[in-house]
Structures are given as C-alpha cells and as structure tokens.
Design a protein with these regions (language model features):
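Short hydrophobic/aromatic patch on the recognition helix
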Residues: 47-55
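Secondary-structure edge/capping motif, primarily at the C-terminal ends of alpha-helices
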Residues: 101, 141, 165-173
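Hydrophobic alpha-helical bundle segments that form small-molecule/ligand-binding pockets
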Residues: 129-155, 172, 176
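C-terminal peripheral helix-coil segments that are non-catalytic and often amphipathic
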Residues: 2, 136, 171-212
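A secondary-structure capping/hinge motif
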Residues: 59-61
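Basic, helix-initiating cap at the start of DNA-binding domains
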Residues: 1-46, 63, 68, 72
C-alpha cells in the first residue's frame, strides 16, 4: 500500500534535514574539504546515491540553509495579504531567521565559509539568486513589471543589503548578533522605502489609481 502524499513529503523532509545536519556536524568536526559524500552518507545512515536525490552537490548541502531561507521567503511573499508591504516582510524575515545562524553549529559553518574565498563568493551568488523571488513582489508593490528599471533598481539594492550582511559577517570573528543585524539593515530599508515611494510618485496618475 502506498503512503499518503503528506506522509511521504514529511519523510522526505526528515531525510533531507538528517543529511544536512550530519554533513554540517562533519564539516565542523573534520573540515569542509576533508569531508566526503560517503562520510556524510554513513553519518546520516543513507546510501550515497540517496544524497543526490536531495542535494546535487556537497556545496548544496553546505548552503542548505540558504535554500531553505529562499523557499521560506518565497512562501512569505506569495502568501502576503493585500496591502502588506514586501519590504517589511523581507526585513522581518531577515531578523527572524538569525536564530539558526547564531547557534553553535551555525557559527562554525559561518567560520568555514569565512575562511574560504571560493565559498564566500558562492554565498554571494546564492544570495543574488533571491532576486528571482523578490522582484515579482517589488513589481507588484510598484504596479510595474519585473523588467521595469525601477523594480530592478529596488531589487538590486535589496540584494546589496543582503550581501552587506554577508560581508560584515565575514569581517567578524563570530556571527553577527541580532542587534548588529538590525543596526545594519534598518538604514538599508529606510533608503529602500524612500526610493520605493519616490518611484511610486513618478508613476502616471492613472496607474497609481489602478494599483491603489
């Protein structure tokens, strides 16, 4: 008898989390480069081929929290109520997702990435991929399209804010505290809100009425 879809999905999620947790523990214990996929499979009690059903590469396991964050942010933006501000949703999301980053394992993963320039560059690239989910929400707030210059400018500035956090985090010996994160991002979002309102004011009056 086949399992209900909900049960199958929960089992898959538990397996994915077990693989990521085992890998992160090994990365901290042995180092990222010294840890192999068979090592991870053995620690997670799965076959090596099973790992590829969840993660295309070892890098994807290391950055699994970024993927999880991206999915959660996409969900938060897609489920927002009419009138909810996309920028405030993103700001709240950034602050609320820092607990994992400041856990003991999270801080050690931070150190691993910080010590490797290639991994730091990959972190920036993965952050930049969030443009795909942020741009539609910004476009909706502006009443424009995702390829509109104003939408692209606000989205790129928001991604720059994410990368500012990553760069400041890399410059510290330990992870940024929630207070430091708030102090960094609040000026970014003040700037973005002002820019967003200025772009709204430049829209033709008819379009403003249609999107109000």
């Amino acid at each position: 008898m086949s399992q209900p879809a909900g049960l199958r999905e929960r089992k898959k999620q538990r397996t994915r989390e077990a693989i990521a947790r085992a890998a992160h523990d090994l990365f901290v214990e042995r180092g990222y480069q010294a840890t192999t996929l068979p090592d991870i499979a053995d620690a997670a009690d799965v076959a090596t081929r099973t790992i590829f059903a969840y993660f295309p590469s070892k890098d994807d396991i290391l950055f699994s929290e970024i993927s999880t964050m991206k999915e959660a942010l996409e969900r938060a933006l897609s489920e927002r109520s009419h009138g909810d501000d996309a920028l405030e949703i993103v700001r709240t999301f950034i602050i609320s997702t820092q607990a994992e980053a400041t856990s003991p394992v999270g801080e050690r993963i931070h150190q691993l990435i910080k010590a490797d320039p290639a991994l730091r560059n990959q972190l920036r690239a993965r952050i930049t991929q969030m443009e795909d989910i942020i741009a539609p929400a910004i476009a909706a707030d502006l009443g424009t399209r995702v390829d509109d210059p104003g939408t692209q400018l606000v989205t790129a500035s928001l991604i720059a804010g994410f990368n500012l956090l990553a760069d400041r985090g890399a410059a510290k010996d330990d992870a940024l505290t929630p207070q430091e994160i708030t102090a960094l991002i609040d000026p970014v979002f003040t700037f973005l809100r002002a820019g967003l309102e200025a772009l709204k004011d430049r829209r033709p009056a008819r379009r403003r009425r249609a999107t109000a």
